[in-house]
């Protein structure tokens, strides 16, 4: 301790401050900054008898938050849509910018349903109203049509201080919730919607997680089980991992265009009841990542099943505007529920979700959405309102955009023709790209792609040779991750492995969006087809 003594002015008393005369070795500095801790790492007692934490090998105080001490549920969370493939894609983009030579000139991110990032232009009316709400001085600009100004003025009038910079009510701005209710009534053929049952949210994801928080409870065999489709959107598995709920998988029927089979629901439920308490059934319609659109009969069967088995029904309907295939139509679970009569409409508990991020608008960055709850216990509804109040309110610009989506221009109004033209152009283009994706992928030996009936994705099944499977396993990778990483490194095409969404054992898939511009999508599909053939030749 001679170095220590020689480096100090004064003595170490229990409450004395330490003054340095000269720079000490780092280990000693750390020791001095962590009073009364042993240089050997042995815990020492403070004057009050409390034991301090050990020092780490590098002489610094041990961290409170480590992988061992953190919430273990967080470590179980996985989100493939922004996982290792996407991280590598970002690295490749930077390498290209630095002039590193690659077999491609750009990275095409076909991994996520972000329409504007893929080049889709905003719908004029949506942005005009948003612009005036953000900067009300634009009311004086004669470039903006009168219906745009009227819409913006109505929204601003409902905001605190007539500014979207003010907090809103936690459930969302009342006039916007009223407009959402009217939209639902129009969509569902006049079935009433109560604005008090509507909760605006930060995209649909926020309200889905909020609802799951309310539903999850119990321990051991009484722990809440949540039934989710496989393949599924990874938000669900991630949220269930974070909440330490039990994930109950039911498999969609790939041989029947990813249809939902009631017998499979019964199998999954019976199996789950052996080890948990299944209380929730989640449906994604149109499907993500699978792109199927459920028939009305299927929805009726699901409602009967949920009622018979006393399950809370969650209907993720964010792709309700994205239906392309002939003979397919979107039917909301609420509409079908009420048309089935009081036996179901007065008893079945339902939460349904919608978003500004998908559809024809694709406004992901605004983070707007809503949830409608049906037949919720009033006491629980009070708890739901309390829970959303903790986060103060959803982003007000997102609420504004949602209002414009659910309350668009009407025939005869100045903006109507342009609005309808732009909306239909986007949906027609998506329908053509859905057809194109199925057609080109099915030309490749070893790739099978079901029809993309709706949503924004294709989820083709790929054959992976046994040699590649063994190599992937040796590297600790899922075979489709191995395939997708090779695809990225050799072509610059970024897609998501099917293993990130769940799939039947022994099958391999990937998810890709249909959002790139048509010419780029054609090129992407042809390159993907060629790569798969090369991959098959190399590993067969």
From Swiss-Prot:
Pathway: Amino-acid degradation; L-alanine degradation via transaminase pathway; pyruvate from L-alanine: step 1/1. Pfam families: Aminotran_1_2 (PF00155). The modification N6-(pyridoxal phosphate)lysine is found at residue 358. It comes from the Eukaryota. GO terms for biological process: 2-oxoglutarate metabolic process; biosynthetic process; L-alanine catabolic process; L-alanine metabolic process. Its cofactor is pyridoxal 5'-phosphate. SUPFAM superfamilies: PLP-dependent transferases. Disulfide bonds: none annotated. It catalyses: L-alanine + 2-oxoglutarate = pyruvate + L-glutamate. GO terms for molecular function: L-alanine:2-oxoglutarate aminotransferase activity; pyridoxal phosphate binding. The keyword Transferase applies. InterPro entries: ALAT1/2-like (IPR045088), Aminotransferase_I/II_large (IPR004839), PyrdxlP-dep_Trfase (IPR015424), PyrdxlP-dep_Trfase_major (IPR015421), PyrdxlP-dep_Trfase_small (IPR015422). Its EC number is 2.6.1.2. Keywords: Aminotransferase, Pyridoxal phosphate, Transferase. It is an enzyme of class 2 (transferase). Belongs to the class-I pyridoxal-phosphate-dependent aminotransferase family. Alanine aminotransferase subfamily. Homodimer. Catalyzes the reversible transamination between alanine and 2-oxoglutarate to form pyruvate and glutamate. This is Alanine aminotransferase 2. It comes from Xenopus laevis (African clawed frog).
């Amino acid at each position: 301790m001679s170095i220590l003594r020689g480096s100090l002015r004064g003595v170490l008393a229990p409450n004395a401050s330490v003054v340095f005369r000269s720079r000490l070795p780092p280990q000693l500095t750390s020791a001095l900054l962590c009073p009364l801790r042993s240089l050997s790492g042995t815990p020492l007692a403070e004057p009050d008898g409390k034991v301090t934490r050990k020092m780490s090998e590098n002489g610094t105080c041990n961290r409170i938050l480590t992988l061992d001490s953190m919430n273990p549920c967080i470590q179980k969370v996985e989100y493939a849509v922004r996982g290792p493939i996407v991280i590598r894609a970002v690295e490749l983009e930077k390498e290209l910018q630095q002039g590193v030579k690659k077999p491609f000139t750009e990275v095409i991110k076909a991994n996520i349903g972000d329409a504007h990032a893929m080049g889709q232009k905003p719908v004029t009316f949506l942005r005009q109203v948003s612009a005036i709400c953000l900067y009300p001085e634009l009311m004086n600009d004669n470039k903006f049509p009168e219906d745009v100004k009227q819409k913006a003025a109505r929204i601003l009038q409902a905001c605190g201080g007539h500014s979207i910079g003010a907090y809103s009510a936690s459930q969302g701005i009342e006039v916007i919730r009223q407009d959402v209710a009217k939209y639902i009534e129009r969509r569902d053929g006049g079935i009433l919607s109560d604005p008090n049952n509507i909760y605006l949210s930060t995209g649909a994801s926020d309200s889905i997680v909020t609802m799951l928080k309310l539903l999850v409870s119990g321990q051991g065999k009484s722990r809440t089980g949540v039934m989710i489709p496989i393949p599924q959107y990874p938000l669900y598995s991630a949220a269930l991992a974070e909440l330490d709920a039990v994930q109950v998988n039911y498999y969609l029927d790939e041989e029947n265009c990813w249809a939902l089979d009631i017998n499979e629901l019964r199998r999954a439920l019976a199996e789950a009841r052996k080890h948990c308490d299944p209380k929730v059934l989640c449906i994604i319609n149109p499907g993500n990542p699978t792109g199927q659109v459920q028939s009305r009969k299927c929805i009726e069967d699901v409602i009967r099943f949920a009622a018979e088995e006393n399950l809370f029904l969650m209907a993720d309907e964010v792709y309700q505007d994205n239906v392309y295939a002939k003979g397919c139509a979107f039917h909301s679970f609420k509409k079908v529920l009420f048309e089935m009569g009081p036996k179901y409409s007065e008893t079945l508990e339902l939460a349904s979700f919608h978003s500004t991020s998908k559809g024809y608008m694709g406004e992901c960055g605004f983070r707007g959405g809503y949830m409608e709850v049906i037949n919720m216990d009033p006491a629980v509804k009070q708890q739901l309102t309390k829970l959303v109040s903790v986060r103060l309110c959803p982003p007000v610009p997102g609420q504004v955009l949602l209002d414009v989506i659910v309350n668009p221009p009407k025939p005869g109004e100045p903006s109507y023709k342009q609005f309808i033209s732009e909306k239909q152009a986007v949906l027609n283009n998506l329908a053509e790209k859905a057809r194109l994706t199925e057609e080109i992928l099915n030309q490749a030996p070893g790739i099978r792609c079901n029809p993309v009936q709706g949503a924004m994705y294709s989820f083709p099944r790929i054959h992976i040779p046994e040699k590649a499977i063994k190599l992937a396993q040796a590297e600790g990778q899922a075979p489709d991750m191995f395939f997708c990483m090779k695809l990225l490194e050799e072509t610059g095409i970024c897609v998501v492995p099917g293993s990130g969404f769940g799939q039947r054992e022994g099958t391999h898939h990937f998810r890709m969006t249909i959002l790139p511009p048509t010419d780029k999508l054609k090129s992407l599909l042809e390159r993907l087809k060629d790569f798969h053939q090369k991959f098959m030749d190399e590993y067969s």
